[in-house]
């Protein structure tokens, strides 16, 4: 867990204390291989921080999938405006999850959380 936290803090240039506080408010979810967490047909907006496994972010144009990026341990993905892309698990995954409503509540209650979420969004 310590190595994972250090990677997350380094990758997104955030304080370890803030990340620990955010993770404490998030729910651990488990995704099956092939499970989609964002697509044009899904309206939910949420944030996932990957603990294990690999996610594939891609667009579909003229029936062909075009890779945007692959995500793995320590990466974060903010699922919003999903009409432009989809996110699917390539392997079984474990991830921390928080809904848009909970993100908004946290950001309204704390400047630190608002800055943390802003920094995570900048790396999308």
Stretches with model-predicted labels:
Residues 1-28, 75:
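Cyclic nucleotide-binding regulatory module and flanking cytosolic helices
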Residues 13, 27-42, 60-63, 71-72:
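Conserved short histidine dyad/triad with adjacent acidic residue
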Residues 22, 40-42, 79-80:
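Short solvent-exposed loop/turn micro-motifs enriched in small/polar/acidic residues
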Residues 26, 44, 82:
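Short coil/loop residues immediately preceding or within conserved phosphate-binding loops
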Residues 34, 44-57, 74:
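Glycine- and acidic-residue-biased ligand/ion/polar-headgroup-sensing regions
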Residues 62-123:
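Cyclic-nucleotide recognition modules
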């Amino acid at each position: 867990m310590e190595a994972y936290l250090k990677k997350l803090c380094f990758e997104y240039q955030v304080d370890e204390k803030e990340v620990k506080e955010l993770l404490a408010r998030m729910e651990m979810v488990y995704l099956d291989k092939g499970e989609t967490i964002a697509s044009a047909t899904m309206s939910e907006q949420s944030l996932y921080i990957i603990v294990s496994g690999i996610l594939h972010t891609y667009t579909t144009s003229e029936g062909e999938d075009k890779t945007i990026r692959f995500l793995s341990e320590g990466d974060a993905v903010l699922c919003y405006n999903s009409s432009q892309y989809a996110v699917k698990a390539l392997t079984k995954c474990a991830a921390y999850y928080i809904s848009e409503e909970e993100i908004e509540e946290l950001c309204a209650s704390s400047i630190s959380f608002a800055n943390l979420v802003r920094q995570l969004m900048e790396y999308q």
